[in-house]
């Protein structure tokens, strides 16, 4: 019997799910102490662990101990012991066979308790389907009681080739090792999470399975669509294209294809059946020919932008969508050209360039059952983009306007510590201390809130949404204004783009940072095989010659506005900027990496090759010699993963290090514990050498220069996994500050990562990396989450923080709001 998703009332998700977490303790509870009381379970269960002998049904992986079933508070609870002490297992893990159809659910939920979580680096849940897995990490929100964990399908990673959420045949629970200490954790109430939504978003899982890049791309654009729908208050479900069945879509009033390249034929046929049955479709960028015919539109060919800013905005046609903005900005680089079919579809919007001229390319086509947008939805201009999306949806399903209006009203004031409008007003007013500017913002919010309610009663939902957004904007800005600034701390932004912020000069971009109280920028000016300034060692990156010496432009601006300039290098990874000629040369010379299975990793330089070490060192020292920078910053100063590098040169150099030949290469490196231990030490030494040499020699060249590194967050495991022994770098004085990449949306987890990292860093300042625009944050404009994590760094006395990544959204929307309060420091700008 297959267990399928019930029709449930959606539950608000605790936004604690992330893809990579590190768990740390705050308690000293002894293992085996009495369990806290279990909270009420008000959701449909998949498994209450009462059927059969769960101590045997949950099968431990080799090296793990059996589970124990406990009766507690009227519930059956799993106790899962993690025997890490003196045990070489990488994880404690258990499997149980199921037969589940989770296709029409949003995910699963369960109760989790771990009194001492430090020995576990991460907790993971896996769902087996076909020939692959869906996986997700999770973290507890407290050590004192049970955490309600929600695993959303949309946030899971794909491993190998799963066959869809309708074919789940096994669940695995794992705790990955961090410390040589035993612990245990408990599970109760494994259940379904959410189903029965009027809007269904189709995720291109079949395409995502091709490789890591396609998975990231699919996740990105599904994430943007999901975020806009959440902000609009539109209840929706994300469905795998491997699970589409027209029969399952009977309650779906609108199907959305956010980015569905190479849709499987079976899925195309099911969507076609859905349309033929009267369904409505919103599609972005691509659409199979069969569906084009049913939708009454025609797609011609891909059109790349003729110049930067060619596709800059979307503007209404003569017969536009009701409620669409006059101008919606979107910096697209490519579109699919489209044509309406006479009598069946029309152009509702056109693409305009950054000078305000029409490109004569349609942006939106509309038919009686379909709206087609000729590119994917991007996250820029989020307020107008959300209204544009609602206009496209409302054209097909008018009832969604009312739902969105009500949703936006209910969201006013629901942010940070506040649950509704009244709580937000009261809380902010209590922090205002008669600040007239803050009180004025609150008055404006009240006025817009009243107008929004009035428009809703009049069924004018477009104005309801507009007024609700303005009310929320004023409340958010009032909240930003009451935040306290801490003078003297290091406030740093990573900037991955060597040309700075798109649409701004380096002078303009640096000025925004300085005006809003930031003290330093880490700017990515060189990679493993490319430089964005005249270099005698590295080839010029694309457009570097055309656009000039970016290092000089950035440094000049930093000197003008008194901002520290630290130059960031992507080490070993040649990446996208490196010319193919240089990559091919490195490969021919045997200087690129080879994985354990002897697959070429052509764009990664081998860290043990002496010439590569010399290139890494000398290229960074070249910057210190040529430019009066305040610092040099390492990134990717590691191996990509455990499976590298196993080239012939690595074998030769490792055998010299080992003092003998290896009979079976590379098998003995993993199968022989003693050789493996030496191998891990060998890898670390290659990375250590580069850090030490750059640190010592750069300070001889430019006394006072600061050396820093962006590092993985969990030193005890990462020193083995990727050869990054950053505690040693701090202890030996090779680093002047360290920036662990603590990219998580969980404040609890963020806090406990920092607690451990400060210990590992010792006397070296630790400026935690906040992942504002990383894939771990669902919303890159979440100023509230950013403020919360900045405040956590202050509570932990780090003396500073580092934010990823400085771009246009950060310049236009994030920095001005930070500068209103939490980073307000006029002395930083002279």
Feature locations, PLM:
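Extracellular ligand-binding interfaces
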Residues: 82-162, 167, 176-186, 191-193, ...
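Catalytic beta-strand/loop cores that center a nucleophilic Ser/Cys/Thr
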Residues: 56-60, 90, 310-383
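Short carbohydrate-recognition loop motifs
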Residues: 65-90
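A glycine-rich, often tryptophan-bearing local segment used as a flexible ligand/cofactor-contacting loop or short
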Residues: 261-334, 343-347, 354
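Extracellular ligand-binding/catalytic regions of CAZymes and related secreted enzymes
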Residues: 196-200, 224-228, 357-482, 815, ...
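Substrate-binding cleft of secreted/luminal carbohydrate-active enzymes
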Residues: 734-750, 757, 764-830
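Helical hinge/lid and interdomain linker segments adjacent to catalytic or ligand-binding clefts
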Residues: 211-295
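Active-site-adjacent "subsite" loops/lids of carbohydrate-active enzymes
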Residues: 488-492, 566-627
